[in-house]
Amino acid sequence: MLASPPFFVGLLPVYFLGQSRYNVAGENGKERTKMVDVGIVFQKMLVLLLMMSVGFAAGKLGVMTQQGNHCLSVLINKVTMPCMLLHASVCGERVLGSGDVLLLTGLYFAGFALMIVLARLYRLALHLAREDSGVYELLMIFPNSAFIGIPVAAAIYGSTAVFGISLLNLPFYVALYCYGVSLIQGVPMGKVDLKQIFSPLMITSILGLALYLCNIRLPDLLAEPMQTIGQISTPGAMMLIGSTLADVPLKKAVCNWRMLLLTAGRLLLAPVAVHLVFSLFVKDEMLLGLVTLIAAMPSASFVSLLAAEYEKNEVLAAEGVFLTTILSVVTIPLMTMLLL
């Protein structure tokens, strides 16, 4: 379904529009750079979609199973992704100064606070059922920053973006386990086991931040295998998402008007709101761009895993991840064109 020819044919004119706008940009260097970025983003999203399509087909054919997906997810989250983030911290270009790093981390925390407010407003406006409200809010709050955000940001800003996005893990897991788990469980935050915050990605992010601030570099003997292992993350994650989406009933997701409104909020309202608010006091275009780009990401696939773990509406969570992921192929380049 994901790889159906009409879907790709419909996207190709949009891609070539981005390329053609670049060609007529003229002598204005800033405008020309912006249009190049749009073309790169369209191309990157098509590449990611192709990878997801392979995973989707593998899931439909039984090559990738639920048990296999679980093992692949553990491998990515505990091995390949930490390697990629750590390599970016100690081997990438040092474009961000120490002040920029601390500011960006603070912006991510502020971004989550803003998304929590937007999610609560959506919950009140849509009159959600009590048992499903937590799932809807989580879909609105938490972006797929690692699996989709990193490759897209790297396509625009280069390898520096990988380290920049890795800083999001700090507020991500703090917000997830201090607020998200209590939200989906329906219990006060004080009853949540905060030890869960210290996941491999969280620990790697803290270590990477410390190494970056101390300007510590690794020898090639360690850096090269770390980079190679980290490169498994993007194709592995895209195939994992595609395989997971193979079990989601698309028709049911499309017919859920509340989910459609939430998808519009997640993919359109969120990046616009973040950009408008933060542009008032953030003057660095790269920092503002990274925060805006993260806000434009689809819902985190982790939400469906969390719903399953706490025996909530797992199907609803999967529908939200499916719908936002598919539509983000169009909305992410659109938001890039309009906001960055």
Roles of regions detected by a PLM:
Residues 14-15, 19-340:
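Alpha-helical transmembrane segments of multi-pass small-molecule/ion transporters
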